[in-house]
Amino acid sequence: MASPALKNTAGFSLIELLAALVIVALLLALAVPAYRGHIVRAKRVQGQATLLKLMQQQERYYSQNNTYLAFSAGSDDAQGQQFQWWSGEEGEDGAARSAYEIDASACPEMAIKQCVLLRARPGTTRVDAQFQDADCGTLTLRSTGERGSSGPAARCWL
């Protein structure tokens, strides 16, 4: 008696499916960290751009008033509120979607008339608390032109 012939069936074998899953897992293992790194760098650049914009505003204020102006997120005075204390876009929820909280104060051991220090702190409670920049930490910009950061990375400002 002859055995019936096996029919050709369409589909994937278990081995083929597992091989495809391994390839997808490898691609994700490489792509996700690179994507996260890109997001951190993009938000860092946004914070730097905001610091530069605010320093330009400070210089304009200095040329009119012969002093710089200290401000923070909790500034009550009208003059302090003219400066944007968050990085990113203006608008109703701009601060909540921002990565950095920005403040201005006198440079250490100097009067506010002589030097202003802008600080951009990542992931505070007033902005996106989930954002952290382990490489650069807090970004700083002085009216003397000095740029800095609190993190271990040497090249935070390019």
Task: List where the protein language model places each region.
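N-terminal single-pass transmembrane signal-anchor helix
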Residues: 1-38
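Membrane-proximal N-terminal amphipathic helix
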Residues: 40-67
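Residues at secondary-structure transition points
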Residues: 9, 41-45, 49, 111, ...
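Alpha-helical interaction segments
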Residues: 24-28, 51-52, 58, 73-76
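Periplasmic/extracellular, small/polar-rich flexible segments of pilin-like filament-forming proteins
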Residues: 64-158
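Aromatic side chains
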Residues: 12, 35-38, 61-62, 68, ...
